[in-house]
Amino acid sequence: MPILNERDQAAVRKEFERIAGPVKLVVFSQSLAAPELCQQNEQLVREVAELSDQITVEVLNLAIDHERAEAYGVDQVPAIVVEGARDWGIRFYGVPPGYEFSNLIDSIIVASTGKPGLSDATLASLQALAADVDIKVFSTPT
């Protein structure tokens, strides 16, 4: 049974008209660690990828493909790496439902363009930071 209904698929296709280049979604799973969540995550990512010919999916096992996981900085499952022409460090842990789903879609578009959609003032403020910043957003299902 599909996760995305026809209305959601149409809305995502419309958003994906803004994709400017290829995007790879690297999914890390492990059937023993979180079988239901990993399966749901893989299905969702595959359904999303079917909505644009610019999106490819690679599914890796966290335990077997540990070198790739380490290279991406992934240490838990389920995980999604959103990668455009380069790796921008965009990661999703857990299945991105609800409001997080729209963030996944936006992240795919941002990764395809390489432009975060921030104002010049915000970009200047970020450039002034003395060190890298790791931003983490946590959410819980409601």
Language-model features: locations:
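Non-catalytic, surface beta->alpha helical segment in thiol-disulfide oxidoreductase systems
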Residues: 81-116
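Structural micro-motif
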Residues: 22, 66-91
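Contiguous, structured surface segment used for ligand recognition
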Residues: 45, 69, 104
